[in-house]
Amino acid sequence: MKHHYLWPILLLISCSPAKKEKCEPIYSQMMVETHGLGDFYCNRHHQAKLDTTGWDYVSGLVAHSVLKAWSAYPEKKAYYDAVKAFADNSLNEDGTFIHNKKGKDALRPSNIDDLPAGNIFFGLYEEEMRQGDTLEASKYKTAATLIRNRLKYDHSRIKAPLPGAGCFFHKAVYPNQVWLDGLFMGSPIYAQWQAKFGKEDTKDNNESWSDIALQFKTIHQYSYNAEKQLNYHAWTATPEDENSFWAQQDGKFKGCSPEFWARSMGWYICLLYTSDAA
């Protein structure tokens, strides 16, 4: 028994640089190579390869994860190349247009689900700048700016005198509805853009950060159940609308969905970290 403390040391020795080729596989790399570069699902649609996959929030999330893995393992150039190919597969030459597999605009009017795949553009921009390819870097900055501007200036919002005025609709087909997962879809890319490029205009930058904060404050104000310490999945400023048939119609949480949703809470926690890190 007295020798059991040696096992951790022996394990470290066995994985020393001199014997690196004999180490067990790094499971995070295995995950990327089996379910990141390919073989994953965009909801119900199977994707065989990341680099040829069309624009979608699921494929975008996978691409962003692969890009993060590449930053941890920069020797894995295939990770970066796959993410870059995924981005380029949906961009025109200068980044002024993002298209879907059919060649149409991938950013549908006021559809917040279409935005988060753009989170990869910041990492691609940084790496292309590091490599000295300013033309490629400019393409990714342009694409990120396109998404940020679509959200800030064109996306439908709740209007006064309704409660929650200024908050983004989840989708145009769901007027005055704010969903917890929708906050994950829009706010991080907005925050990252402001952190990286927003300092060029101080007044606009301050207004934009206030706008981002408003999204968080609104959803928390209307969807948080202090007793349960959870946020309801969705809230609508117009619960009486036919389109808001799911909403509670009276009581303290009028306008909220009747249920909590574990996945949306997970997205909410992730976006708090992502937006704060920006």
Predicted regions and their residues:
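Sec-dependent signal peptide recognition
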Residues: K2-P8
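Carbohydrate-binding/catalytic loop surfaces
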Residues: C42, Q47-K49, H64-L67, H99-Y125, ...
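C-terminal motif of bacterial Sec signal peptides marking the signal peptidase cleavage site
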Residues: I13-S14
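Short, contiguous, pocket-lining structural segments
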Residues: G54, V178-M185, D204-D211, F253-Y268
